[in-house]
Curated annotation (Swiss-Prot):
Transmembrane segments: 1-21, 29-49, 61-81
Source organism: Platanista minor
Entry similarity comment: Belongs to the complex I subunit 4L family.
Name under which the protein is recorded: NADH-ubiquinone oxidoreductase chain 4L
Top-level enzyme category: translocase
Lineage: Eukaryota, Metazoa, Chordata, Craniata, Vertebrata
Gene Ontology cellular component list: mitochondrial inner membrane; respiratory chain complex I
Subcellular compartments: Mitochondrion inner membrane
Subunit structure: Core subunit of respiratory chain NADH dehydrogenase (Complex I) which is composed of 45 different subunits.
Keywords assigned by UniProt, alphabetized: Electron transport, Membrane, Mitochondrion, Mitochondrion inner membrane, NAD, Respiratory chain, Translocase, Transmembrane, Transmembrane helix, Transport, Ubiquinone
Record-listed E.C. numbers: 7.1.1.2
GO biological process: ATP synthesis coupled electron transport
Record keyword Transport present: yes
Length: 98
């Protein structure tokens, strides 16, 4: 395993632990999710380039599309929640209210 792959896996695990530790704030959770998607994108791109497996060239592009959709939905929810409740604490949301 090369040093670049180990660094990317370390970045993914750091983002995952950040997501688990800072799940109380929506903005921190979204940033950790973006870090995970960025490391996954780079890892899949490097793996495809190293193996010369041409049938899976579209996988990084599909991953970028999912990351962009996740970011757009996450930011829309963040704006809606922060304008409604005045904070981005996930614990302050009561999902049972109408």
């Amino acid at each position: 395993m090369s040093l670049i792959n180990m660094n990317l896996m370390l970045a993914f695990t750091m983002s995952l632990t950040g997501l688990l530790m800072y799940r109380h704030h929506l903005m921190s959770a979204l940033l950790c999710l973006e870090g995970m998607m960025l490391s996954l994108f780079t890892l899949t791109t490097l793996t495809i380039l190293n193996t010369h497996f041409t049938l899976t060239n579209m996988i990084p592009i599909i991953l970028l599309v999912f990351a962009a959709c996740e970011a757009a939905i996450g930011l829309a929810l963040l704006v809606m929640i922060s304008s409604t409740y005045g904070t981005d604490y996930v614990q302050s949301l009561n999902l049972l209210q109408c």
